[in-house]
Amino acid sequence: MAITIRRAESRDLDKTLKLLSEVLELHAKIRPDIFISGTTKYTREELQAIFDNDQTPVFVAADDSGEVVGYAFCVMKRQPFSTNMKDFSTLFIDDLCVDENCRGQHVGTLLFDYVKQYARDNGCYDVTLNVWE
């Protein structure tokens, strides 16, 4: 299976929402004290606005048929000049997901490599990622 990484488009909304829902349900199962099962992280309109915003690039991994099998939600952040730090940009990975049926096929690695190259191409100092545990 050949995988293509590209910016998310309107045609990717449904599958991205489905993957977001799967991630939310996993989080709700593990941390019901924080996450609410059966809800959504974004509405369709909110997700479209995120797709359209250059400060919040979303990249998708698509298979040969164009089906989205993973995503990386990113946020461009700028550290303004201060008395102790220079001005610089960073690309923050807010969310990364690979479809359960495609795990172990290096889709996540392809997404991460693409994000790193995008950060370099856009003058970012680094790429950051937070994890919960």
Q: Which role fits each region the language model picked out?
A:
Residues M1-D14, E22:
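Conserved N-terminal entry element of GNAT/NAT acetyltransferase domains
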Residues A8, L96-V98, V131:
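Hydrophobic adenine-recognition pocket in adenosine-nucleotide-binding enzymes
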Residues E25-E46:
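Conserved GNAT-fold acetyl-CoA-binding loop/helix
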Residues E45-V60:
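A short helix-loop-beta-strand connector motif used in the catalytic cores of GNAT acetyltransferases and
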Residues V60, E67-M76, C97:
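Conserved beta-strand in the GNAT
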Residues N84-E100:
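Conserved acetyl-CoA binding element of GNAT-fold acetyltransferases
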Residues V98, G104-Q117:
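Conserved acetyl-CoA-binding loop-helix of GNAT-fold acetyltransferases
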Residues A119-V131:
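Conserved GNAT acetyl-CoA-binding A-motif
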